[in-house]
Amino acid sequence: MKKFIATFALMATVMGMQAQNETKDFVNYERGYRADIALSTSISEQYSITTSHGYSFGNGLYVGGGVGFTAETFLNFEDEPHYLVPLFADVKYSFLNKRVSPFVSARVGGIFNTEYQMNRMLINPMVGIDVRHFSIGLGYELQHNFKGLIENKASMHNVRLSVGYIF
């Protein structure tokens, strides 16, 4: 009888540990602080690295804020790229509490250039898939140019591909 109880207790412990390992893969449904880092590119030759930090409500909803660094190489009138700093609010909703989950997200904020007066408003809705701790998304990005070097072009429209890691 003692062997049976010891074996049962050992199996219950192992199953509990296995269940904990499996649920750690579902980062979108864990309540508390969450962060991510992402690399992205757009069709207009912008290359970015961003990080977002915020709160996950435990039901698939994440709200946070982020900052990044962007190199913009499409402006033909100069040989050197422009370096920009995006600052944004970030909202994301993951639909499933599974290892693979589709999501929708939106980033709204500003893009700031310290070299020139070329500050822009940023709107970036995105759809994608989270696979465990990794995320891949495809989105539309609108950058409205307030004032600066790009004359006769009030806004820029991009398709942005993003690959990220969720902590």
Tell me what each language-model feature is.
Residues 39-43, 67-73, 95, 108-114, ...:
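Transmembrane beta-strands of outer-membrane beta-barrel pores
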Residues 40, 52-54, 92-94, 126-130, ...:
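Transmembrane beta-barrel domains of outer membrane proteins
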Residues 22-24, 70, 120-167:
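Predominantly the C-terminal beta-signal and adjacent terminal strand-loop region
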Residues 60-63, 98-102, 131-138:
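Repeated loop/turn-to-beta-strand initiation elements of outer-membrane beta-barrel proteins
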Residues 19-57:
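Short glycine/proline- and aromatic-enriched beta-strand/turn motifs that initiate or cap beta-hairpins
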Residues 31-33, 45-47, 81-87, 100, ...:
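Residues that define the transmembrane beta-barrel architecture of outer-membrane proteins
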Residues 1-28:
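Cleavable N-terminal export/targeting peptides
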Residues 38-48, 74-84, 111-120, 148-156:
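Solvent-exposed loop/turn segments connecting transmembrane beta-strands
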